[in-house]
Amino acid sequence: MMKKLLAGVLCWGLLFAAAPAARALTVEPATDRTFDLPCQAAILIDEDSGTVLYEKNADEQRPVASITKVMTLLLTFEAMEEGRIHADDLVPVSEHAYHMGGSQIWLEPGEQMTLDDMLKAICIASANDAAVAVAEYVGGSEPVFVSMMNEKAAALGMTNTHFENACGLDAEGHLSTARDVAVMSREVLLNHPLVKEYCTVWQDSLRGGETQLVNTNKMLKSYTGITGLKTGTTGKAGVCISASAERDGLRLIAVVLG
């Protein structure tokens, strides 16, 4: 269901890429009355300009599940590009990270895994334990890292977002909006293109082949031009996705929540 809904949004937006002359015209954004999606909230934006092409309840605060990890990835890639951490660093696993529920790669306390492999686990399998382990490695602790997440959200103008954890598990006050998700998604896609290399991998493995990873974003197999980004599902959030796609030079970001 989620795949069909989001594909509909992207197909609608990508119609502009089908005709070369279309990009020279003024695009009139759709409204709820002309184009509606059976979801709680959604937004479609042009990745390059940030222009909003469609929105529905885009400023309504909602849980966003593992789409939270977009911010975790954003801060991690920033730290890598600043030289504070490196892809071949060994990231230790704490008791706290070990106890994360939901999607995981079954990390053990005291286990070490390269940052590169942790990023694969986050981007491909949406592993909560890996997300928290990386958050602790970058920030020193998850609470400190979450403060960094909220500071970054404020700096990006994400005024309706507040994070309580680094992985997106349901928590009181852990909320964002379709618009804010689009903002942070655009930030990581434009400024940290390495994220696409991780998020577009369909299958990989860890621990010498013992742990198999299959991407949670099934649109990689069903929609031509998908470049990312992150799915998410929890009891409170429902099914969510922030998806990016490119065709004929037109790059779009679609966010569907609930």
Specify the residue positions occupied by each region the protein language model found.
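Bacterial N-terminal signal peptides that target proteins for export
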Residues: 1-9
